Amino acid sequence: MSNNIPPIRYRRKITGMSAILLPLLSETEIDWSGLRDHVARTADAGLIPAVNMDTGYGNLISSRERLEVLRATQETVAGRPFIAGAFVGDSPDAPFDFDQYRQRIDEIQSFGGTPVIFQSYGLTHQPASQLIESYARIGEHAGSFYAFELGTMFAPFGAIYDLEIYEQLMRIPQCLGAKHSSLNRRLEWQRLQLRDATRPDFLVLTGNDLAIDMVMYGSDYLLGLSTFAPGEFARRDAMWEQGDSDFYELNDLLQYLGFLAFRAPVPAYKHNAAQFLKLRGWIQTSLTYPGSAQRPEADVAILEEILKRLDA
């Protein structure tokens, strides 16, 4: 596979999917009104809401909370599309648990969503042939799904697949696309080249919040960063499709926000998201789910300066 940079694809219509932050009223109480408002805000902007992802603490919330998020999302989108994380928690020595994945898929589909298959130790620790067989079983049961490559800077159970495995994943017809979260342009460019040669309708969904201009090269996106500013992301995407040079200035400002929020430790971006949404008056507190990484309060002043520039 060549490492050449793929060409820029001007005036392309971008598919945007935005992970939804789960807001809190207290350490033990979810802000359901704030969640519904943010799902509506995202869908109204023209982006596809993605719930129970990392941004929504999909690996931390209880099964009751997970189902309530799905119910609230279904009611809010009112027939519009949404996707949701299918997370199976396990341990490093656990076998692949198809039954747990099947249950998560059934839950999501019962509320009208399309599943995004989170990795797990049991899934990613398999030999390549068994790994692909597991995804094929998931596809046969789900009918349609999105895969998810997650770098270990986000979660210890994640894995970035080699290109041979990625090609086999693309050949599973029920797999509509895959989120790629390596934070590495070169690896994502390779996937775009492989996609173009193998299955042009397959969505390479960038999860690179440090390189949101990957959409210029043919990636679509499923980002946590867009939860900070779904309307601005939608406006940026429309500028690209229209050939509007203002795309670059807005993209630069959104990327500045991404560099701040997604610095190490990367999982603490969710605290920055809560701080930013509170500054916007969209949620009531900047609390995060118990067990989440935190940012210093000093970040708020920088976030406020970015918000003023976005609103200018």
Question: Whereabouts are the PLM-identified features?
Answer:
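Active-site beta->alpha loop and helix N-cap motifs at the rims of alpha/beta catalytic domains
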Residues: 2-160, 292-295
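C-terminal alpha-helical cap/extension of soluble enzyme domains
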Residues: 3-6, 18-21, 46, 219-220, ...
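Catalytic alpha/beta core domains of metabolic enzymes, predominantly
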Residues: 140-266
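General structural feature for long, well-ordered alpha-helical segments within catalytic domains
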Residues: 31-34, 38, 65, 69, ...
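Alpha-helical scaffold segments in soluble metabolic enzymes
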Residues: 72, 137, 168, 235, ...
